[in-house]
C-alpha cells in the first residue's frame, strides 16, 4: 500500500499545479517521497487536505483511481519506481510519470526511427529497410505512431515479428491520427505504448515536442529518415545530441542546412542505407553489457 500511496501522492501533487512539473519532479526525486512533499505543500498552504476530507482518505481516493486505470490496462510508473526506464531517468526532460500499455522490457536495445508525416517513396523504403533490419536483429524499434515514416517503422517491425514501442503525443485512451487506431492496438498487444500524459489528454502543439524528448531519452540512438527544419524529427535529433545519444542522418538530408550542421557534431553519423546503422549496433551497447540484442 505504501507504494500505491506514493503514486497517489505524486498524482495529487501534479494535479494541484503549484509548481512546474520538471521542478516538482526534481524535488520529489531529491526528497525521495511524494507523500512527504505533499504533506509539506499542504502544511505550507494551510489547506491540510487535498479536497475537503482527511489527507489519508484523499490519497486512498486517488489510489482507487489509479487502480481503475490499471484495470483498464494502463499501468502507471512514476519517477520513484524502480522500473521507471533508466535511460529516460538520466535526461532533464524526464516526465514525472509514464502510462504503459503492453509489455515493458527493461534490458532491450532501443533505436528510434523517425521522420516526416509526408514522406517520399524513397523515404518509406528506407524506413522499412532500417526498421525491418533492426527488428530482425532483435533491436526494439521505437517511433511516435505518426503518419508516414513512424507508421512505416512500426508496421515493418511488427511484420517481421520484431518488437516495437510507440511513444505517443496523447493519452492512451486516444488514437492520433485516427487511422492508426488499429496499429496502436496491435502495438499494445505485441509491443508497448508509452504516454507521459493523462489518459484522456488530446493532441496539442506542445504534446508532440514533449513526446520527442521522451522518445530520445528512452532510446539509445535516433535514425532520422526524412525531415524538414520545422519537424519533430529534426527536434528529436537535436535533443538526442543534447542527451549524448547517437544520431544517424540519411545522406539525402544533407540538402538541408540543419542536417549539414548536425553532421559536424560529435555522435552524428551520416548514413547511405540500413547497413550503416546495423554496423554500429555494437557501439550502442554500454560497457556494462546489460542490454541485450540478438
Label every model-predicted segment:
Residues 1-81, 262:
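Short, small/acidic-rich helices and loops at N termini and domain boundaries
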Residues 1-6, 79-294:
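Glycine-biased, small-residue-rich flexible motifs in mid-sequence functional cores and linkers
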Amino acid at each position: 500500500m505504501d507504494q500505491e500511496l506514493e503514486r497517489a501522492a505524486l498524482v495529487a501533487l501534479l494535479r494541484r499545479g503549484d509548481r512546474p512539473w520538471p521542478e516538482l519532479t526534481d524535488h520529489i526525486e531529491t526528497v525521495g517521497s511524494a507523500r512527504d512533499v505533499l504533506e509539506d505543500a499542504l502544511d505550507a498552504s494551510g489547506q491540510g487536505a487535498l479536497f475537503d476530507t482527511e489527507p489519508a482518505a484523499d490519497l486512498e481516493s486517488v489510489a482507487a483511481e489509479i487502480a481503475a486505470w490499471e484495470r483498464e490496462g494502463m499501468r502507471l510508473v512514476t519517477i520513484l519506481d524502480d522500473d521507471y526506464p533508466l535511460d529516460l531517468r538520466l535526461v532533464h526532460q524526464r516526465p514525472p510519470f509514464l502510462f504503459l500499455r503492453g509489455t515493458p522490457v527493461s534490458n532491450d536495445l532501443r533505436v528510434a526511427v523517425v521522420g516526416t508525416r509526408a514522406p517520399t517513396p524513397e523515404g518509406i523504403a528506407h524506413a522499412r529497410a532500417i526498421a525491418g533490419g533492426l527488428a530482425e536483429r532483435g533491436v526494439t524499434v521505437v517511433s511516435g505512431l505518426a503518419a508516414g515514416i513512424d507508421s512505416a517503422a512500426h508496421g515493418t517491425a511488427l511484420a517481421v515479428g520484431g518488437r516495437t514501442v510507440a511513444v505517443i503525443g496523447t493519452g492512451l485512451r486516444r488514437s492520433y491520427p485516427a487511422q492508426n487506431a488499429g496499429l496502436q492496438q496491435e502495438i499494445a498487444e505485441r509491443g508497448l505504448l508509452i504516454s507521459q500524459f493523462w489518459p484522456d489528454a488530446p493532441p496539442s502543439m506542445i504534446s508532440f515536442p514533449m513526446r520527442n524528448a521522451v522518445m530520445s531519452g528512452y532510446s539509445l540512438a535516433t535514425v532520422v529518415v526524412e525531415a524538414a527544419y520545422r519537424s519533430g524529427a529534426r527536434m528529436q535529433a537535436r535533443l538526442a545530441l543534447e542527451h549524448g545519444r547517437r544520431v544517424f542522418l540519411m545522406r539525402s538530408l544533407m540538402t538541408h542546412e540543419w542536417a549539414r550542421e548536425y553532421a559536424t557534431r560529435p555522435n552524428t553519423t551520416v548514413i547511405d542505407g540500413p547497413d550503416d546503422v546495423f554496423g554500429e549496433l555494437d557501439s550502442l551497447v554500454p560497457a556494462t553489457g546489460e542490454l541485450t540484442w540478438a
